[in-house]
Structure formats: C-alpha cells, structure tokens
Amino acid sequence: MASRGGGRGCGRGQLTFNVEAVGIGKGDALPPPTLQPSPLFPPLEFRPVPLPSGEEGEYVLALKQELRGAMRQLPYFIRPAVPKRDVERYSDKYQMSGPIDNAIDWNPDWRRLPRELKIRVRKLQKERTTIILPKRPPKTTEDKEETIQKLETLEKKEEEVTSEEDEEKEEEEEKEEEEEEEYDEEEHEEETDYIMSYFDNGEDFGGDSDDNMDEAIY
C-alpha cells in the first residue's frame, strides 16, 4: 500500500520568502514589536481654486444664491426646532418663526404639478374683541320724580278702566235679574189660568145618580 503522503514531493507546497528584501540579514534577530501609534499623515495644503471670472460665472453664482434663498423660504423647507425657554414671555406667541403663506411669491403652472403640492392660504383667526359698553349715568332726583308721576298716571288709568268694567258688569247683572223676574211672572200667570180653568173640587160628582137609588151600591 502506498503511504498517505505519497512521497516527499506530494505534500504541501513549500513557501519561499526572501528576508533580505525586508531589510533583515541572515542570522539577524527580528526587531521587537512597536507599541506606539503610527506617525500621522502629513497635512495637505487646501488651496482654493481660482474663481472663474466673467459674466457667465457671475450669472451662475447669482442664480445659485437665488435658488437657495427660494428653497429656504418654501414651507417644505425643514428647519431646526427652536429650543424652548424656561420662562415663557407674552410676546413669544406673537412672534412667528415660520414663513406665512401670503408672503410667498411663487406662482408656478399648477397644471403640471399635482394638487397635493398646491399651496393653500391659511387664514389667521381673529381674536375675539370685547365690546365695552358706555356706562349709564346715575339717575338723578328729577328722573325719579318723573318715573313716580308716570306710575301714578298709569295707576289712575287702570283704576278708571276697572271702575268702568265693574259698572258694565253691574248693569248686565241688573238686566239679567229683570229678565228673570219677568219670566217668573209669566209662569205664575200661566199656572193660575190652568188652575182656574181645569180645577174640579168634586162637588158635582154623582149628582145624576140620585134618581136611581134603588140599585145596589157596591
């Protein structure tokens, strides 16, 4: 049977490394490990590129600055939150940090943009104003006397009206009593006529039967 190695040349490949290329001669000991950080990279000199001179460069620079300013004034520009103060002041709520929709002069062609991006003008809510009514002057003695006179005249008028109503009621009651008396007299006369014409005391009863007394009476 053949051995597992299959001979001397069938093993792993031998690695050859030239130590002299690193700066170490034959028989020299290896240098000790360095425990210090590696030296820093030398600083680079950042020199600005010379600006292009001419009308084209100035136009591009002005256009770029205008675009940046317009982007910062849009409501979609995210700004860092303002830190809240420990002590709130009365004027803080009236100082608006963000831009107002009415102050944005941006009128693009909205037919080419979606409706969601269209700016909607917000209406500021008006604060409720309290109406201060003028104070009425205090009533003087003359005003009091006038009111008392008016009340007295009203009382007199009411008394006159009530007295007239009472008189009318009394007249109506008297008329009703007179009508009732007349009605009673007429009824009394009718009753007496009926008594005089139809009353029979029974004296004439049996006058014709005296001639036939012989008959038996049961």
From Swiss-Prot:
Keyword tags: Nucleus
Compositionally biased spans, kind Acidic residues: 161-193, 201-218
Compositional bias (Basic and acidic residues): 139-160
Cellular component terms per the entry's GO annotation: nucleus; RNA polymerase III complex
The protein's assembly and partners: Component of the RNA polymerase III (Pol III) complex consisting of 17 subunits. Pol III exists as two alternative complexes defined by the mutually exclusive incorporation of subunit POLR3G/RPC7alpha or POLR3GL/RPC7beta. Found in a trimeric complex with POLR3C/RPC3 and POLR3F/RPC6. Directly interacts with POLR3C.
Subcellular location: Nucleus
Organism: Bos taurus
Annotated segments matching region Disordered: 130-218
Upper taxonomic lineage: Eukaryota, Metazoa, Chordata, Craniata, Vertebrata
Name this protein carries in UniProt: DNA-directed RNA polymerase III subunit RPC7-like
Chief subcellular location: nucleus
Segments forming a coiled coil: none
